[in-house]
UniProtKB/Swiss-Prot annotation:
Listed GO biological process terms: rRNA base methylation
Presence of the UniProt keyword Disulfide bond in the record: no
Reactions accelerated catalytically: cytidine(1402) in 16S rRNA + S-adenosyl-L-methionine = N(4)-methylcytidine(1402) in 16S rRNA + S-adenosyl-L-homocysteine + H(+)
InterPro entries for this protein: RsmH, SAM-dep_MeTrfase_MraW_recog, SAM-dependent_MTases_sf
Protein's name according to its UniProt entry: Ribosomal RNA small subunit methyltransferase H
Family to which this protein belongs: Belongs to the methyltransferase superfamily. RsmH family.
Primary gene name: rsmH
Major subcellular site: cytoplasm
Keywords assigned: Cytoplasm, Methyltransferase, rRNA processing, S-adenosyl-L-methionine, Transferase
UniProt entry tagged with the keyword rRNA processing: yes
Annotated positions binding S-adenosyl-L-methionine: 31-33, 49, 76, 97, 104
Lineage: superkingdom: Bacteria
GO cellular component: cytoplasm
Length: 301
């Protein structure tokens, strides 16, 4: 399955790839952004993804753009280390597309989806990540489960859901996404005028916790800012308010010249778009996943 890149035209317009430029696609996925960048200019792309399953998409791009795409299976918080290892000190742009991809959601064996029964995993990487969702729901205390569901999912029934999870695991270990979704639905009903499944926020929260997504995002932006050439850009596409809040705060710190993740980068950044860029109605119609997407971008002066 191919993951349709969101806000692709808007990303390209801002990044404006140049011949001879060096760009980082920090969330490679199926390579949609990388392909667009490589098509736009005679440039180099260094692509990163922690998901081992994305390697096959890299192979296709490598065939189409020989010697211009370079791929690394790692977390994007390691951008600086990855590039240092290949003697790249500065780049002209870094692009992040945050969150879970369509490919990951559609593959039941990955354990991300509450609509497809599969093993309760949710790890973006089976080699780089530690605790999976199964271990979380079966071993973490009721209080912490409730806190995670509330903090990362904004779920107002977090305590009720946590209690139901603990009650269920006391009888039998929770092993599948279907089991977990059923437990949640047994205590939280779908509201009459709302199409969102009652399991949505809880699954999001557990996924964020398992993959340390918000911590990784902070580190990734800080490292990206540290490797930009003058005129270089960071572009972040996020899909929910927790991610967007981190991007907004990090960009403000950079523009204000504040220390970011122990990196004192000094003054020299400015926002490219004062207002959030959102997908058009046409894009949302053709790709409903784009509905909640928000793009923010920053420039190194």
């Amino acid at each position: 399955m191919y993951h349709t890149p969101v806000l692709l035209k808007e990303m390209l317009d801002i990044l404006s790839p140049q011949n001879g430029g060096i760009y980082v696609d920090a969330t490679f996925g199926s390579g949609g952004y990388s392909r667009a960048i490589l098509n736009s200019a005679d440039c180099q792309v260094y692509a990163i993804d922690q998901d081992e399953y994305t390697y096959t998409f890299y192979e296709k791009l490598s065939h189409d753009f020989p010697n211009r795409i370079h791929f690394f299976i790692n977390k994007f918080s390691k951008i600086q280390q990855i590039l240092n290892n290949v003697q790249i000190k500065k780049v002209d742009g870094v692009v992040f597309d945050i969150g879970v991809s369509s490919m990951q959601l559609e593959d039941a064996s990955r354990g991300f989806s509450f609509s497809k029964n599969g093993p309760l995993d949710m790890r973006m990487s089976t080699s780089l990540s530690g605790v999976d969702a199964r271990m979380f729901v079966n071993t973490v205390s009721e209080v912490e489960i409730a806190n995670v569901i509330y903090q990362y999912g904004g779920e107002k029934y977090s305590r009720k859901i946590a209690r139901a999870i603990v009650n269920a695991r006391n009888k039998n270990m929770i092993n599948t996404t279907g089991e977990l979704a059923s437990i949640i639905r047994s205590v939280v009903s779908r509201s009459k005028n709302h199409s969102i499944d009652p399991a949505t926020r809880t699954f999001q929260a557990i996924r964020i916790w398992v993959n340390k997504e918000l911590e990784e995002l902070e580190k990734g932006i800080a490292c990206a800012a540290n490797i930009l050439n003058q005129g270089g850009k960071i572009i972040v596409i996020s899909f929910h308010s927790l991610e967007d809040r981190i991007v907004k705060v990090m960009f403000k710190l950079l523009c204000d010249g504040k220390s970011v993740n122990l990196l004192n980068l000094g003054l020299g950044f400015q926002l490219i778009n004062k207002k959030i860029i959102r997908p058009t109605a046409e894009e949302i119609h053709s790709n409903p996943r784009a509905r909640s997407a928000k793009l923010r971008a920053i420039l190194k002066l």
